[in-house]
Amino acid sequence: MLGAVKMEGHEDWSSYYGEPEAYSSVGNMNAGLSMNPMNTYMSMSAMSTSANMTASSMNMSYVNTGMSPSITGMSPGTGAMPGMGNGVASMASHLSPSMSPMSAQATSMNALAPYTNINSMSPIYGQSNINRSRDPKTYRRSYTHAKPPYSYISLITMAIQQSPSKMLTLSEVYQWIMDLFPFYRQNQQRWQNSIRHSLSFNDCFLKVPRSPDKPGKGSFWTLHPDSGNMFENGCYLRRQKRFKCDKKPSLREGGGKKLSEGASSVGSVGNSSSERSVGNESPHSSSSPCQEQKRSLVDMKSSHGLSPEHATSPASQAQHLLSQHHSVLSHEAQSHLKPEHHYSFNHPFSINNLMSSEQQHHHHHHHHNHQHHHKMDLKAYEQVMHYSGYGSPMAGSLAMSTVTNKSGLEPSPISSDTSYYQGGYSRPIMNSS
């Protein structure tokens, strides 16, 4: 290898590669060729060193061209190998007069047999396989830092269930997640905010205040006793069904345990649309949405806490409004059953059809005063634009008044009749055929 170092130095070739050193290098080449054919990687390296040396010193450029493509693996065909063997044999016959050309030919062809040719090329590919095998290690190392396929509810549930007391503080939940998943050791403010939201807005987590024998900071969080079947068969990748707290009616008496905090905030993530429509705009901001639903059910069944006007049935309330506001009674009765005051049409997938009657009654109870300001504007808009919804009784009165050349603002007698059929569609008589 001294020759290789000197060759990189770009010094005079003749001073380093004289006759004795050339003979010794050919002897090393023959020794390398006569080695075991299975150890072909060492023999090929010996051949490449000696061939480059002798080709440079003896100006035998054809040997170098015959050797280099097969060594570098650019053309590992069998055609380049016999040429290399012949070049080595001729080189050996020129340099070593005492060695017969046939022995050098036999030795070189023995090392470059077709079966050995495959083995001689395999160390080159094996080296690339070694380099390629290092990549999955780095990939696996980065894969451990990837985001785990668990939702925040799954992470909180796993953390609580592995604790001996089955309850953890918020900081203990954070620490458990960071210890188990390295991904959550960065961007802590972002995902910890999501953890707090998941704890607050999901009914499956209960907030337990600290007892006097456990001093410290922060309340404990535990799982709801009825939420054990959220993750079936212990698989935390997908939650089977959302847990609702209305399955346990005795939760209203649990004074210290609040199932949810901040139910009056507008952007409540994790709540369904019915819970948002009831819980977010209710005046009872300290209680949970499911408690609001239960309270609305109780208010519908027993009328304490409500005025006599709102405690009555929807039909009697519509009749009560008939005696007071005859001009807008149809729209008031319609909007009572469909409490969304921004729209007057009845879409099949609107929130009005998806909400139950108890939720609609409770929702209307809080929006009654707000609707009173909008009903005149909506009526005037419908009559001016000559366009109203399918389910609005004003459609029949407007179309009938238009067909019979009446004034658009004149109330039609048909509006008083359609107020008793709020559930059906009112269509113009002229277009019914």
From Swiss-Prot:
GO terms for molecular function: DNA binding; DNA-binding transcription factor activity; DNA-binding transcription factor activity, RNA polymerase II-specific; protein domain specific binding; RNA polymerase II cis-regulatory region sequence-specific DNA binding; sequence-specific DNA binding. Its main location: nucleus. GO terms for cellular component: nucleus. Residues 147-241 bind DNA. Residues 261-282, 315-331 have a biased composition (Low complexity). PANTHER family: FORKHEAD BOX PROTEIN, HEPATOCYTE NUCLEAR FACTOR 3-BETA. Acts as a transcriptional activator during early development, limiting the extent of mesoderm formation in the gastrula. Binds to DNA via the target sequence 5'-GT[AC]AACA-3', with 5'-GTAAACA-3' being the preferred binding site. This is Forkhead box protein A2-B. The gene is foxa2-b.
